[in-house]
Design a protein with these regions (language model features):
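Recognizes extended acidic, P/S/T-rich segments that occur
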Residues: 57, 61-97, 115, 161-192, ...
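Preference for solvent-exposed, low-hydrophobicity sequence contexts
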Residues: 162-185, 196, 200-241
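Pro/Thr/Ser/Gly-rich low-complexity, intrinsically disordered linker/stalk tracts
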Residues: 20-61, 96, 113-153, 210-233, ...
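Surface-exposed loops/turns
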Residues: 47, 96-97, 191-192, 279, ...
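Beta-strand-rich modules
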Residues: 64, 89-117, 183-218
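Aromatic, loop-rich ligand-recognition surfaces of beta-strand-rich domains
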Residues: 254-324, 356-398
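Disordered, acidic Ser/Thr/Pro-rich linker "stalks" and the adjacent N-terminal cap
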Residues: 213-278, 291-294, 298, 344-352
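C-terminal motif of bacterial Sec signal peptides marking the signal peptidase cleavage site
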Residues: 15-18
């Protein structure tokens, strides 16, 4: 019995060490010497900043992919691959409308490549240039507003330059990173004095536009002193003292989950409150911070839609049946959630967005005001309450 067991063990060892070890990382295929057939009938569809190449695939069961090689605008060699299950590939990121030579190869599972097929593409006007040609600006409070169109919805950066203190160099001041189809970007924080500015566009492929240079004087803009703010009670206003909340917490320079204004609960919408800014001002913009916290941002009582009214004279007691007699509607505000994720879900971009405060610019033609009245019309969750983390206002004090 012992002899039989020893024989079995010996045979097992011999079989184990006689097995050839297979390297699963090596290329594999039907014939290691075969060269794949190239693509045929290549058709070119030029697009902004690139092209889509359509082709007929060879009838080769060992085909792995199609590879395109070309030299990008910045001189670097680029490679784009498409699987054997699709009959096209896309080239993007070219920065002009020059002709570009593209070389196509097929690749099999043994990583053998076919003979080359060369085609020429002529990209349409690239996104970086299309955005640049659409740029416009208008002088505004504390700076200017840059408008742009981005019809291809490409990822671009719009850079803002200003002349430095020596007057000899242009320096970086601000940038907008976007893939929105169009937009207006306010450039803020600039002094009320003449200076030279520049705007240019760049994309993720290092393509850069020319620079628009202009000389302007931004309008004066003051950050309003929150120590002058006071709350008021006008007919039709709701209480803002629920769960240790207080209306003055909305302008105490503290943004926390334990320091916020909270309406009584539950109270049917709309929810109104009135405040005195302490000065008469031509408002330019304001910033609204939601109550922070994972369980409340873009939910609970975070306002989704609301209106802002103003007036210069101190309001009388008013009437609940006519709550806005003597008030001017300054703007309607619609809170934005960048990710558009469902209720209770949010992205890091959402958190970053609201942590900076959601900013709203007042129309240029609004009257001078001292008193403001907010009317909350809907919360993000539908709950019958409203909360405010913090408010800040800018404008030209009269």
């Amino acid at each position: 019995m012992n002899r039989l067991l020893i024989d079995i063990v010996c045979v097992s060892f011999l079989l184990f060490f006689s097995c050839k070890e297979e390297n699963l990382l090596q290329p594999y295929g039907g014939n290691e010497n075969s060269i794949p057939t190239p693509v045929s009938n290549v058709q070119v569809k030029n697009i902004p900043g690139g092209a889509v190449l359509y082709y007929d695939l060879p009838k080769d069961p060992d085909l792995l992919s199609v590879k395109a090689i070309y030299t990008a605008t910045n001189g670097s060699q680029q490679t784009v691959s498409a699987s054997a299950y699709v009959d096209s590939l896309k080239i993007v990121g070219l920065g002009n409308t020059n002709d570009y030579k593209v070389t196509l190869f097929t690749v099999n599972h043994m990583e053998k490549i076919s003979s080359p097929v060369e085609v020429t593409i002529t990209p349409q006007v690239p996104p970086v240039q299309r955005v640049f040609e659409s740029l416009d600006y208008s002088v505004d409070f504390g700076g200017f507003v840059v408008s742009y169109d981005n019809d291809t919805e490409s990822e671009v950066a719009i850079y803002i330059l200003r002349q430095d203190s020596t007057g000899n160099e242009m320096e970086y001041y601000d940038a907008l990173y976007t893939k929105s189809k169009q937009g207006n970007y306010p450039v803020r924080g600039l002094p009320n004095k003449e200076n030279q500015f520049g705007i240019y566009v760049r994309d993720r492929y290092e393509n850069t536009s020319d620079t628009i240079l202009f000389t302007e004087t931004p309008m004066r803009e003051d950050l309003l002193d929150k120590s002058l703010f006071t709350s008021m009670k006008v007919a039709g206003d709701v209480g803002w003292n629920f769960y240790s909340g207080d209306p003055t917490y909305a302008w105490d320079d503290k943004v926390s989950n334990t320091n916020y204004a909270h309406t009584d609960f539950p109270v049917e919408f709309p929810h109104r409150f009135t405040m005195d800014l302490g000065v008469t001002v031509k408002l330019s913009r304001f910033r609204f911070w939601q109550r922070p916290g994972d369980e409340v941002i873009y939910q609970h009582g975070a306002p989704k839609h609301y209106k802002v009214y103003g007036r210069a004279e101190k309001p009388e007691a008013g009437s609940a049946s006519d709550p806005f007699a003597g008030w001017t509607l300054l703007m309607e505000c619609h809170s934005v959630k960048p990710s558009n994720l469902p209720l209770g879900q949010f992205s890091s971009e959402d958190v970053e967005f609201i942590s900076k405060g959601e900013e709203f610019s007042f129309p240029r033609d609004i009257p001078n005001v001292r008193y403001l009245r907010f009317e909350m019309q809907e919360s993000w969750s539908g709950m019958k309450c409203s909360t405010i983390g913090e408010l800040a206002f800018w404008g030209e004090i009269q």
